[in-house]
Each structure stands twice: as structure tokens, then as C-alpha cells.
């Protein structure tokens, strides 16, 4: 169910900074029409830290409504407070999400026993699948393959991981410990080719916000074992993968989407719009990928 190109959706805001539901509905529909195989609302790219709980829940509800079962919706339900994560996960299930994505707790830096406790409590509070989001670059702490394996062994609804460690060897290590059926999704567009070669089955992608069709074709080539075609697509996409992260995400993707006329280029403080030099590099990368003239 969870494989291929899965988009970590931006949350559009209007010029007054409010959630732009109309733009979001059109954006979700466009993603599906372009071949995206799954949707992740209210993750990091969705500016979750600056959404109210009501907004967080509304974004999920709208995404599920527009998707209408055409592709799975993996709702963000992360928090560094276990009770809050449980409440968000339960709302996602009630709203009709197919799975939840739960990030490793950030800032308070739990140890491995704390990580086990957090995830086991969240997953036991719901009946839908849970995907672990391991991103040491933002959370500081790194869930080890051994802790992940213990969770998979003890909690049948922990079905996969979004791995943003940047360590390609982790795919093989987690495959050995968690089993070949454990779903491993890359959390980094630029390394997704190698990730898939090691046994990954897709990517929760930022770049697919802007280039959904190309990212879908890239993942399809990987899953078919056609790595020559995947490499050709990677060559087209790599400048965009890099340019979108020249400034903190999602400032790059929101600018690029505004260039495509999909959303307003509006972020919530403390996030700010990109500088002119960065915009020029993103424009160049979009031209290289064939997205603009």
C-alpha cells in the first residue's frame, strides 16, 4: 500500500496567512492526477510547528476528503509529548487516514528506551498502521535499528519507516533486523536512488510537491529494477533536489510552487521567503527539469 512517490505536502496559506483550503484542494487533486502514489499532510514540509491543532486537523480532513480513497493518506501525528501524539493519531484515524507518520520526539532527546515507550504507546492507541519518522537532523536523537526491530517485533501495526538519516547502509541494516516486508521509505530525495537499490520501496518526497510526475516516474523505474532509466530521471531532478534545500524547507518548495501558479509564496514566521539568489538557482533547476521555460 505504501510505496512509490509519496508527497510530503506543503500547507498553502493565503496572503493574510490563513490556511488556503481552496488552493490545497486543487493542489491535492493535481498531485494525484500527476501520478503521486500517497500523500503526507502536516509533516515538516507542511509547517506543522506553526499550525494550530484545529488547523492541523482540518488539513488532514481536507486531504482525506479530496483524495477520496484514490491514494493512501499518511497523516502526520508527531509530537515530543506522547499524550499529544496519541490525541493527534486518534484524530487521524477517526478522520479516515490510512496510516500515521510519527516523528521521533525532538528537543527533549529521549533515550532508546524512551523512544520504544513513546512509539509503543502511540501505536497501541490506534488500529491503523504507523510509520516511524527517523530524522536525527531535526530531532537530534537517532532511533537505532535494534530499537526499531524491537518495536516491529512487539507492535504489529508498526509497518515501516521514513528514513532521513542520510545513511544508505541503514536500509540494509533495518532490512536484516526488521524483515524484508518492513516498508522502508527514503526521507531524502537526493539519495533515494541508492536507498531503493538497498531495498527501499519509495520516497516521502519534498521535490514531488513541484515535480510530481517526474518523481513518480523515477520511483516506478526503481521499483521495476530499471535503474538506467531511474538514473536519467535523477540527472534531471538532482539540481532541483539540491536547490530546494538551499534555505530551510519549505521556503524553497513554496517559492517553486508559486512559480507554477499553484499557491501563494507565503510562510509563517519564523520561516521567511527565500532570497533572490536562491530564487535564481531554483528557477535554473526547474528549467533543467523541464518544469518551466
UniProtKB/Swiss-Prot annotation:
One of its GO terms (biological process) is lysine biosynthetic process via diaminopimelate. It is found in: Cytoplasm. The record marks 44, 107 as: Part of a proton relay during catalysis. Pyruvate binds at residues 45, 204. Gene3D superfamilies: Aldolase class I. Pfam families: DHDPS (PF00701). Its EC number is 4.3.3.7. SMART domains: DHDPS. The active site is at 133 (proton donor/acceptor), 162 (schiff-base intermediate with substrate). CDD domains: DHDPS. GO terms for cellular component: cytosol. GO terms for molecular function: 4-hydroxy-tetrahydrodipicolinate synthase activity. PROSITE patterns: DHDPS_2. It catalyses: L-aspartate 4-semialdehyde + pyruvate = (2S,4S)-4-hydroxy-2,3,4,5-tetrahydrodipicolinate + H2O + H(+). Keywords: Amino-acid biosynthesis, Cytoplasm, Diaminopimelate biosynthesis, Lyase, Lysine biosynthesis, Schiff base. Catalyzes the condensation of (S)-aspartate-beta-semialdehyde [(S)-ASA] and pyruvate to 4-hydroxy-tetrahydrodipicolinate (HTPA). Homotetramer; dimer of dimers. This is 4-hydroxy-tetrahydrodipicolinate synthase. The gene is dapA.
Amino acid at each position: 500500500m505504501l510505496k512509490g512517490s509519496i508527497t510530503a505536502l506543503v500547507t498553502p496559506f493565503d496572503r493574510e496567512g490563513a490556511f488556503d483550503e481552496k488552493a490545497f484542494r486543487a493542489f491535492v487533486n493535481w498531485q494525484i492526477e500527476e501520478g503521486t502514489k500517497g500523500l503526507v499532510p502536516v509533516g515538516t514540509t507542511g509547517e506543522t510547528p506553526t499550525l494550530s491543532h484545529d488547523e492541523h486537523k482540518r488539513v488532514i480532513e481536507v486531504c482525506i476528503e479530496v483524495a477520496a480513497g484514490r491514494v493512501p493518506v499518511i497523516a502526520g501525528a508527531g509530537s515530543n509529548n506522547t499524550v499529544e501524539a496519541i490525541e493527534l493519531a486518534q484524530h487521524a484515524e477517526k478522520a479516515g487516514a490510512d496510516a500515521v507518520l510519527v516523528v521521533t520526539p525532538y528537543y527533549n532527546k529521549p533515550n532508546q528506551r524512551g523512544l520504544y515507550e513513546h512509539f509503543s504507546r502511540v501505536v497501541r492507541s490506534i488500529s491503523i498502521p504507523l510509520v516511524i519518522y527517523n530524522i536525527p537532523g531535526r530531532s537530534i536523537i537517532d532511533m537505532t535499528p535494534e530499537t526499531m526491530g524491537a518495536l516491529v517485533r512487539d507492535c504489529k501495526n508498526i509497518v515501516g519507516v521514513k528514513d532521513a538519516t542520510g545513511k544508505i547502509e541503514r536500509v540494509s541494516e533495518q532490512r536484516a533486523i526488521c524483515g524484508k516486508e518492513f516498508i522502508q521509505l527514503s526521507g531524502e530525495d537526493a539519495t533515494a536512488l541508492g536507498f531503493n537499490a538497498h531495498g527501499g520501496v519509495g520516497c516521502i518526497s519534498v521535490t514531488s510537491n513541484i515535480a510530481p510526475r517526474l518523481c513518480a516516474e523515477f520511483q516506478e523505474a526503481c521499483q521495476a529494477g530499471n535503474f538506467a532509466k531511474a538514473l536519467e530521471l535523477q540527472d534531471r531532478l538532482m539540481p532541483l533536489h539540491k536547490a530546494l534545500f538551499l534555505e530551510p524547507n519549505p521556503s524553497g518548495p513554496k517559492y517553486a510552487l508559486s512559480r507554477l501558479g499553484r499557491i501563494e509564496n507565503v510562510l509563517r514566521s519564523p520561516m521567511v521567503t527565500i532570497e533572490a539568489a536562491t530564487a535564481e538557482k531554483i528557477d535554473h533547476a526547474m528549467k533543467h527539469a523541464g518544469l518551466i521555460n
